[in-house]
Amino acid sequence: MAKLRVGIVFGGKSAEHEVSLQSAKNIVDAIDKTRFDVVLLGIDKAGQWHVNDAENYLQNADDPAHIALRPSAISLAQVPGKHQHQLINAQNGQPLPTVDVIFPIVHGTLGEDGSLQGMLRVANLPFVGSDVLSSAACMDKDVAKRLLRDAGLNIAPFITLTRTNRHAFSFAEVESRLGLPLFVKPANQGSSVGVSKVANEAQYQQAVALAFEFDHKVVVEQGIKGREIECAVLGNDNPQASTCGEIVLNSEFYAYDTKYIDDNGAQVVVPAQIPSEVNDKIRAIAIQAYQTLGCAGMARVDVFLTADNEVVINEINTLPGFTNISMYPKLWQASGLGYTDLISRLIELALERHTANNALKTTM
C-alpha cells in the first residue's frame, strides 16, 4: 500500500510560535514512517508559508527558550478546491506533490481559532482536529464558558471585558462579584499568554492592560482553589477519555515559562493520584464538555478539583501541545496508547471525518 503524505503545518504568526515548533519536532520524530511520508509546511512569524527540509528545519531544536524555524527558499501558495495539486510553489507556480492529509499543530491565534481550519475546509483537505466552529468556540474563553454553563457544566464565575466596556466595572465591583484572587486572561490566547493572577487593585489594572495587548476581549474569572487536573479526549462521534493527570505547581500559577521554559516550574503526575471514582467522574465530564463544544479528533480538557471533589472546568484545548512535557500524549501513553499509535489514530480520524463531510449533500 502506498504511504500517505502528511502535511505538518507548524509555526505561525502567534505568541505560541516556539511551542508549535517543539510540538512539530516531536510529531515528526514519532510518526510511523512505514505508513506516512512527512511534508513540513512551516509558517514563519510574519505569516508566510514555506516548505521546509525535514532534515534541517529547526535552529536550537533542543532549547525551548531559543528554538527557531530555519529559513526556507520555497514559499508556498494554496489552490482551493478539488485539484490534483492543492499546494504550489509560489516562486515559480509549479505544483508540489499532493498532500493527503494535514496535521495542523499551530498553537494559538490563527492556528487553533478556526482560521486555519476554515482555509483547509475551503481547500477540501482532510485535517487533524476540530472543525471551524468548535475550534473558534474553544479558543474564545468567553464563548466556551457560556456554552458550557448553558449545558449545565460547572465553570468558574467570570465577567467579560471588551475595549468598549472595559471601564464598566470598578475593581470594587469585580471583587464583590468574584472575590480574590482573580485571574485575568485574553479571551483568545493559549499557553497562559497574557494571563495574570491578581490580588489587589494595582495588579488588576496592570493585568487588564496586559491582557488587552493580546486580544480585544478579556475574561476576568474567580480564582478556584483546587488541584489542576487534565484529561485527554480522542475521537469523533464516539470520543474516548484517557486517565487523568495532574499539574503540581512550584510557582504561583501555570504560566507560559512554567509550561515551556522552566524545567522546575511544575511537575506532571500521570496518572493523577485521585480516587478511581473521581477519575471516572472527570473523564465523563471531559467527554460531555468535548461533545458540548462539538470537538473532533482530539482535545485536552483542563479542570480544577476542589477539596470536596467538586469538578470545575477551566478550559478546552483543541490543539494540545506535543512538546516533551505536554500532558496530552503522556495521558494516552498511560492509558495504553503509545505516541506513534496516537499520531496514526489522529490521522485516521481526520480521514474518517473528511469522508463523512464529503458525503453530505451540497445541492437540493
Swiss-Prot record:
Keywords: ATP-binding, Cell shape, Cell wall biogenesis/degradation, Cytoplasm, Ligase, Magnesium, Manganese, Metal-binding, Nucleotide-binding, Peptidoglycan synthesis
InterPro entries, alphabetized: ATP-grasp, ATP_grasp_subdomain_1, D-Ala_lig_Van_CS, D_ala_D_ala, Dala_Dala_lig_C, Dala_Dala_lig_N, PreATP-grasp_dom_sf
Binding site for Mg(2+) 2: E315, N317
EC number(s) on file: 6.3.2.4
Domain ATP-grasp per the UniProt entry, residue ranges: 145-348
Pfam annotation, one family: Dala_Dala_lig_C
Binding residues annotated for Mg(2+) 1, in chain numbering: D302, E315
Annotated positions binding ATP: 175-230
Known role: Cell wall formation.
HAMAP family: Dala_Dala_lig (MF_00047)
Family membership noted in the UniProt record: Belongs to the D-alanine--D-alanine ligase family.
Protein name listed in UniProt: D-alanine--D-alanine ligase A
Lineage of origin: Bacteria, Pseudomonadati, Pseudomonadota, Gammaproteobacteria, Enterobacterales
